Structures are given as C-alpha cells and as structure tokens.
Amino acid sequence: RYGTEQGVREDYCFLFHGNIPYAGSYGAGFAQTVSEFIYVFDGTPYAIDPAHQEIVTNLLLEHTRWFLAAGQIDMLVRGRGYKSKGYWGAVLESLLVLAQTSDARKNEMASAAIGMLKAFPGINLSLTSAGFADGLKPGSGEMPIGFRYWPTGEIGAYNQPSFHIGFRQYSDRVQDYEYLNRADGGEGEDGWNLAYGFTNILRKDGKGSWYSKDDQRTGSMLSGIDMERLPGTTSRIGGNPGNPKFQYDPSKPTMSTTGYSLNFGRSKLAGGAGEDGGVAGFVLKPAYGEFTARKSLHFFPKGFWALGSDIRSTAAAGASNKKPVQTTIIQWPCGNERPTLILQKGSVQLFPDSTLTLQKIKWFWLEKENVAVVFNEPATVFIRLKNNILSSWLDHGPDPLQAGYAYAVLPGISLEETSLFADEPPFV
C-alpha cells in the first residue's frame, strides 16, 4: 500500500528516514529489489497483486525518472548521501526488468528505458539487464519534459531537452535534511540549506557538474562546493550549528547521532503547480538563522525566474552578531581557471581565490559555459572564484527588513540570446 508517512506516498514521492526525499537512494534500491521479485513470480500462483505492483511502477514512471540527467540522479532525492554522485543504473535495471513482465504499463517502461539509454548510452549494466536492453524493440523513447511537483515531499522538477532543474521547499509537512553519524563515519552534516529553495541545475552535456568525473558510478562532490551557499537558497551565513561527531556513550542505547538535523518546518504555506511550465513557492521559516522570507520560482523553456520578498530578520537587536542574510544565485564549476564574465557593458576576467563586487549590473553571462543570470532591476552582485567554482550571491545585510530579489537563471543560452532576453524582461 502507499505509505502514510514513509515509503512511496500517495503522489508517488519516496520518503524515508522521516520526511526526507530518498527516491535516488533507498527508493532506487527498493524499486530494483521489488522489480526482481515481480519478474520472478510473474505468471505463477505467487504473482504480486497488480494493486501492489503499481506502487513500484508509479514510483519509477511518475517520480524517480524526473530526477535523472546526464547519467546521474539529482542529489535532492538522495537524502544524506548527496555528496556521492547518484548512479541511475538501479532505476534503468528496474525498468528493463518490469518491461519483461505482464504489467499493464510494460510498454511505457520499455519506452522509458529506451529514453535513458539514448540519453546516456555509455551506462554500465549487469549481463542480464544488458540482455534485456538488447531485446527492446526499436521505438521512441525520451526523457520526461515539463514540470512536476510532489507535495508530500515539497519537491519539484523542471526538465527541458538540454537541462534539468530540481528544487526543494520547506514547510511543517517535511524535514530539512538528515545527518547520521556512527562510529564508522557519517554523512549529511552540511545539509542545513537543502530544503530552503535549493535549485539544482544539471546540464545534459555534463557542464557545471558538482561531482568528479573519475568514476561513472561513484564520483564524489567537488571539495570546493560551498554548502552554505546553495543556489536559490536564502540563509544567514554562519547561522547554522555545526553537527557533532559521534561519541560513544555506554549509557545510551543508540549508536548514532543525528545532530541538529531532521527539523520540521514552521510554515504551512508551500506548493507548486504546472505541466509544461510551472510555478512554486513557499514561506521560508528556517530552523536556524532567525529570519523569514517569501520565495517563488517560475519556470519557462529557457530557465526560471526566482522571486523573493519580505526577507526580514527576526533576531533581537544585535543578536545576529552581524552575520549576513544572503540569497545565492548560482554556484558553477568552470572548465577554465580564469573564466570571463560578459556584462551588459564590458567584461570581467576572474582570477583564482578572488572575490569582487559588481555594482548595479543588469545581467552577466559566463563565457564558454553558456550560463546567464538576468536581473529585473540593476543589482549589486558578489562574485567569488575559488577552486574553479564561481559563486554569486546577493547580500541583504545582517538585519534585513522587507528585502527582496528578482533574477532569472538561464542554464544553456548564448550571449546574443542573453542580451535579447534582458532587453524585454516579463516584469514591470
């Protein structure tokens, strides 16, 4: 049956270890194992009831595959394992196995598998799954395009032929992140801001990837990624508590610690809707940081507009200790040690370990990466280049009162298209 708290929920979102999106980790393993059982017992007296079988089918077709791009699974559905590159082999193998059964949607699963093989033809498969792949009838198969939102996880996806954008939102129905530390190590300690509006961009050509390219299956997150400045998030920099390491205590039965994680939100307002395009929004009341913000995303074929309003500190006077509230725009690993930003007027070459302030700019375009940011009104933007990773953000100060922002991120666009887009923004 569909879960009421964890597992596959009624909207096909997979939640685990509380209300944490996990379709790309535990959910993928669950789908792979159950698919094998369905295949083995198909057509026998022990066949799985179709009403139960559809739970796995819906998880794969209506949720998990929306978070696949460039051979990896979006980190937003990997729970505490976000620092390891998600490999989509388990998802593909589940689809290939179910396509061999009498499932009513087996043709859809075959088509989905073909789409994955076309999108990432170099994927490694087991011998059995490779045989199933060879046996697929030639036909059309594409990765999903458009917008989807899953309210039980406050998580959404927007897909276009050249890019994927996953995002999370925060409410009293979901938890922020999971940190788990044991004597043998831990994961997830830096996940404070994952639910605070993080817009995770995956380009289908692999550019801008946050993960090392040394292994198809197990690439690790680049060491220079700043987890306090996740794109799309608004946060008080330095305002989150550091999670403690595991310490053995013979008086306690538990052998692990979850630190300061697994906090439910305090706002009831969050949601999203759409099909070809989409819109989503929420009121951010973070677990730590003492501020609030109203945030929304508006998706269209070139990318998305991010809007923020009523960003205000809730800290007592002087209590914030001058830690600034900031909204991060992008964090982009560059293929060039000295990347160039093209501006409306002129250009700026960045140097390693440098931070600069661009005053009142209308837009910038990252040369050779084809990524652009356009502001509705001229904005003062902070730019940092460290470990070949370009980060940009807006600073609202330590005590904001009704601060806001409006910018568009265009993940795959030429310089000429950027200039034309900036000349006719959709807002007045």
Regions found by a protein language model. Name each.
Residues 30, 37-428:
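Extended polysaccharide-engagement surfaces of secreted carbohydrate-active enzymes
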